[in-house]
Amino acid sequence: MAAPLPRSLSCLSRAVGWWSRQPILMTQSTAVVPVRTKKRFTPPIYQPKYKTEKEFTEYARKAGLVIPQESLERPIHLACTASIFDAYVPPEGDARVSSLSKEGLAQRTERLKKNVASQLSIRRIKESDPNFKVKDFPEKAQDIFIEAHLCLNNSDHDRLHTLVTENCFPDMVWDIKYKTVSWSFVESLEPPQVVQVRCSSLVTKSNTYGQVTVRMHTRQTLAIYDRFGRLMYGQEDVPRDVLEYVVFEKHLANPYGSWRMHGKIVPPWAPPKQPILKTVMIPGPQLKPGEEYEELQREAHKPQLA
């Protein structure tokens, strides 16, 4: 039994020796190693409990909830127009040219054409405002004009909003925040007169606006002071004759609307306005610490002995 063991060992040694004598071949092998990455999250598909909006609304009503209706439309409140449509053009020299001359005849013909358009507009205004009368309107317009300008004296902007339109309000209060306005009405040189009436619609045919142009020849006083109390424009004790063409507007579609001042028409032949008096600061003397300006004035005016 001991003889076969050495024979098997010799066979194994021969095989190992033969394998060791073989040339070694260098080969490259690719290995795929699985690497775990971050798993992407996919949200589940949302399945609403109520498939239609009607089912959701019915369920909310049963639960006692009131869902406000969402509207993509934004309402716009058009209380007034943005400008004066078909503005009245005052004739040269306030129509004082003789009707026998060529210029006077042309002015009279143009006035007749405008009167026809004014009569049609008056008819449309009376359909919405039956109380409108051309004879009574000038006095009412003059009262609105006087009260609106008196609101500038005490800066009553709340009352001014009810007398002028949103288009006219910025023009009246512009650049008078730090100023003092003193305006007064002296007298009316000529009775106010309606020179033009226009009626137009905006956005829709039923949304109509009426504009009435009133000629006013009055005597007024105006003085504007800056924030330091220095006079910038006009004089309080010197009245001046003023010829103005004032436009009044009313939103006829609004049953609670009223006539308000909308703007003024300045004719091209009107005289230029008085320029504003500009005030400048005069630099005083440089004071040392502890000195006062009054002491320097006393020393400057102190009599000197000869």
Swiss-Prot record:
It holds the Pfam family Tim44. Keywords: Mitochondrion, Ribonucleoprotein, Ribosomal protein, Transit peptide. One of its GO terms (biological process) is mitochondrial translation. It comes from the Eukaryota. Coiled coil: none annotated. Its main location: mitochondrion. It is found in: Mitochondrion. InterPro entries: mtLSU_mL45 (IPR051975), NTF2-like_dom_sf (IPR032710), Tim44-like_dom (IPR007379). SMART domains: Tim44. Gene3D superfamilies: 3.10.450.240. SUPFAM superfamilies: NTF2-like. One of its GO terms (cellular component) is mitochondrion. GO terms for molecular function: structural constituent of ribosome. Transmembrane segments: none annotated. Belongs to the mitochondrion-specific ribosomal protein mL45 family. Component of the mitochondrial ribosome large subunit (39S) which comprises a 16S rRNA and about 50 distinct proteins. PANTHER family: 39S RIBOSOMAL PROTEIN L45, MITOCHONDRIAL, LARGE RIBOSOMAL SUBUNIT PROTEIN ML45. Component of the mitochondrial large ribosomal subunit (mt-LSU). Within the mitochondrial ribosomes, required to direct the nascent polypeptide toward the tunnel exit and position the exit at a distance from the membrane surface. This is Large ribosomal subunit protein mL45.
